[in-house]
Structures are given as structure tokens and as C-alpha cells.
Regions:
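Glycine-aromatic micro-motifs
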Residues: 1-171
């Protein structure tokens, strides 16, 4: 089964389970030499940045669920592209599929979308720098700041389904 690295709305366990019912979260991971950015359509992408890391969630996705994931990310319309990239998970480095948005920003995040991503990032207890970056995107989108959830396992975040995906870095 392919590994998939999620850094946006697919970090949400409940939403990902609806889209890809056989997928299993493997834990937190990071994509080195990239930085979160907002594309023109208002969704996240991972843009190349030698000084940055994008933190997210590594999933084990069944082949039977890949079509649904590609449809959700609007791969056929060209909103996103996907590529195999090395990611560093809790159990070491792995090759994983990563979706990159085709329209590199700058943009302003869609408010409901970024609120859901921020909730999922907090639930997964992603690093403070990642939370701060997402909070800055949320503030720019006019999303009110909320307190992080109390301990425990990652919970589901609000049901958010972006109409578009993330911008692809075309260097």
C-alpha cells in the first residue's frame, strides 16, 4: 500500500477516513526543504525552501482508495500534481506520495479550510512553528484564534473539503 504525506485537510482523521476508508494513519512526519504556502485558490501547498520543513501526517493508503484521494485533490483538473518524496516519520525516512498545488501563491487561505487544518495540526500536536505558521494564515483569513485541544489522541477536526488543492512549486 502506498504511503501518503498529508499537510492540509487530509490530516483530519475523520475526513480522511470518509474519503479513504482503508487508510491508516502512521503518525507525524515531515517533508524537508519545503515550506507551507497558500496558493491563489486559498489552499495549502508545500513550496521548496531549503531552510524549511513541512510537518504533517503519514498515511498508509490502500490502492483501492488512491482514486478517491486523487479526485479529492483534483489531480485530473491539474489543481494538484503528485510526486514521490522522501519524508521523515517517527520510524525513520520513507518515500511517500505528496500532492503539490499547481498555482503558487501568494494567496489568502479559505477561512473554513484553514480553521480545519489548524485544528487537525493541533490534534496531532505538530511543532509550535507549524502551528504558528498556520495561525498566521488563519489570522490573514479572518479566523478567530482558539485554544488548542487538551491532550489525548488526535481527534477529528471540522469537516472541511476544499474546492481546490495546493500550489505546485515550479522551479
Amino acid at each position: 500500500m502506498p504511503l501518503y504525506f498529508a499537510y492540509g485537510s487530509n490530516m483530519d482523521v475523520e475526513g480522511m477516513t470518509r474519503r479513504c476508508p482503508r487508510a491508516k494513519p502512521l503518525g507525524r512526519a515531515r517533508l524537508a526543504r519545503h515550506q507551507l504556502a497558500i496558493m491563489r485558490e486559498g489552499w495549502l501547498t508545500a513550496a521548496r525552501d531549503v531552510r524549511g520543513d513541512v510537518h504533517g501526517v503519514l498515511w498508509d493508503v490502500a490502492f483501492a482508495d488512491m482514486r478517491a484521494l486523487d479526485q479529492y485533490e483534483q489531480l485530473a483538473s491539474g489543481l494538484y500534481t503528485k510526486a514521490q518524496q522522501p519524508v521523515i516519520g517517527e520510524r525513520g525516512a520513507k518515500q511517500a506520495l505528496v500532492y503539490f498545488g499547481a498555482n503558487a501563491g501568494p494567496g489568502v487561505a479559505a477561512a473554513d479550510y484553514i480553521a480545519g487544518v489548524l485544528a487537525a495540526a493541533r490534534n496531532w500536536k505538530l511543532p509550535a512553528a507549524t502551528i504558528a505558521r498556520l495561525e498566521s494564515f488563519a489570522a490573514a483569513a479572518g479566523v478567530a484564534r482558539s485554544a488548542p485541544p487538551a491532550g489525548g489522541e488526535p481527534a477529528s477536526s471540522p469537516r472541511v473539503r476544499p474546492r481546490f488543492a495546493t500550489p505546485f512549486d515550479r522551479d
